[in-house]
């Protein structure tokens, strides 16, 4: 496990010292070499007994670790086209940021101590901020970076305070210990619980603290959007699962408020998506709705809820990352993300429209998509918590189907604008990029046992 993190450190150094013509090749080849042993871990029986002094891997962290490693070569593949014109130093920094960010994510998912997890959690802030503010497309990227930094830091400070307090009371921050019953006063439990999960709710994000996400997605380059939607949001869900498993029922006393916000967020985000005219903005808001169901699954505190949330996070990471790639594919050719100006793509790029079609179906959790299994399991857990929640979940499912069909129909059907008929064709790099998102999403349909 430690060798995997050291591999990313070596890859960052390799990107810095290699000659200009080899920067992207070193990054891509190195990330693929690190990806190969990670995929072998999927077939291993990783339990909580596989714990070293610093690193661990179990059913909670393994899937997200492999997802992070899988997406790195795809981010480099998606970014290569628009980074060719940059100077050598900026290319090195760009590739180095992505490699460092992936290494920090792997360290966060495999940390066996809450302090190490917090350090890795915060280490993702700077490279993500650099990707947004330096390589964003418009001047609003600075505002997006400010929002992202403000929400992240404000949410993370209570977490640090709570971790310090926990260490003073218990003398340990190990993830494999149970801390249930440590607090004797109920108000201290509520205070600690809210302080701990606030950082994770901001990172997910939960409806109400989600304002940074659409801005960051819209202004970020394709690599930033992919890592945000694919993995960074999952840090919040992973952190909530870890904290909940450590403290058990003791830490669930104040979860009703957040569960209510999550259910309301599913409905509201579905309605907002139907009003969007920007491709990236629509996909970003849909992420908030899907992550709200993850919050609901985790905060129910039952095993089914955890399993559903885990499947949802992995499925959403692949689907949303691919949707952002497809949106960027069109943006690089037309310089627009407006839905009304993106009509008739099926007439221009018929094969890529198949990718749009499959990902739209997965986004709405149509059978037999892996998203369906995650959503059903999470919904069962929420229904057991409160039968009234089925009203919000049903309405959210209808709205999700509506905006997914709206996204596909508005972008693929209709009359193509005349100035878009002579666009350059899809390259093999872009076909490969789309395929590498589709293959694991389809593979997991037939091997659900890997995640249950």
From Swiss-Prot:
Provide this UniProt record's keywords sorted from A to Z: Electron transport, Membrane, Mitochondrion, NAD, Respiratory chain, Translocase, Transmembrane, Transmembrane helix, Transport, Ubiquinone
Q: Which GO terms describe its molecular function?
A: NADH dehydrogenase (ubiquinone) activity; ubiquinone binding
Q: Quick one: a GO cellular component term?
A: mitochondrial membrane
User: What is any one GO biological process for this UniProt entry?
Assistant: electron transport coupled proton transport
Report the domain of life of the source organism. Answer: Eukaryota
Topology in membrane? Multi-pass membrane protein
**What EC number(s) is this enzyme filed under?**
7.1.1.2
UniProt KW Membrane keyword? yes
Question: Localized where?
Answer: Mitochondrion membrane
The UniProt entry's sequence similarity note says: Belongs to the complex I subunit 4 family.
This molecule's function is given as: Core subunit of the mitochondrial membrane respiratory chain NADH dehydrogenase (Complex I) that is believed to belong to the minimal assembly required for catalysis. Complex I functions in the transfer of electrons from NADH to the respiratory chain. The immediate electron acceptor for the enzyme is believed to be ubiquinone.
Q: What is this protein called?
A: NADH-ubiquinone oxidoreductase chain 4
Can you name the source organism?
Answer: Branchiostoma lanceolatum
